[in-house]
From Swiss-Prot:
Family under the similarity heading: Belongs to the bacterial ribosomal protein bS16 family.
Biological processes, Gene Ontology terms: translation
Protein's gene: rpsP
Name of protein: Small ribosomal subunit protein bS16
Regions annotated as coiled coil: none
Gene3D superfamilies membership: 3.30.1320.10
Domain of life of the source: Bacteria
GO cellular component entries: cytoplasm; small ribosomal subunit
Length: 87
């Protein structure tokens, strides 16, 4: 089973916020997920990001692939470097 770390959209029309989840790559964007590891709210100024870093690193070690957007967020927060050092 190939897993992805991706954003799941929630919120009202034109007021989105996103949950960062671990999901099977075959499931729908807002469908079934394995684990919730945080949330991201880009509408706040500055954008709010709350992640369980230990869980994200553990899933990266297990082979979960972040989507392009999540990859950019993880790079910006320095989590990918922490995961590389832990490996």
């Amino acid at each position: 089973m190939a897993t992805k770390i991706r954003l799941q959209r929630h919120g009202a029309k034109k007021r989105p916020f996103y949950q960062v989840v671990i999901a099977d790559e075959r499931s729908r964007r807002d469908g079934r997920f394995i684990e919730n590891v945080g949330y991201y709210d880009p509408t706040k100024n500055p954008a709010v990001l709350k992640l369980n870093v230990e869980k994200v690193i553990a899933w990266l070690d297990k082979g979960a692939q972040p989507t392009d957007t999540v990859n950019q967020i993880l790079k910006k927060e320095g989590i990918l470097e922490k995961a590389a050092q832990a490996a």
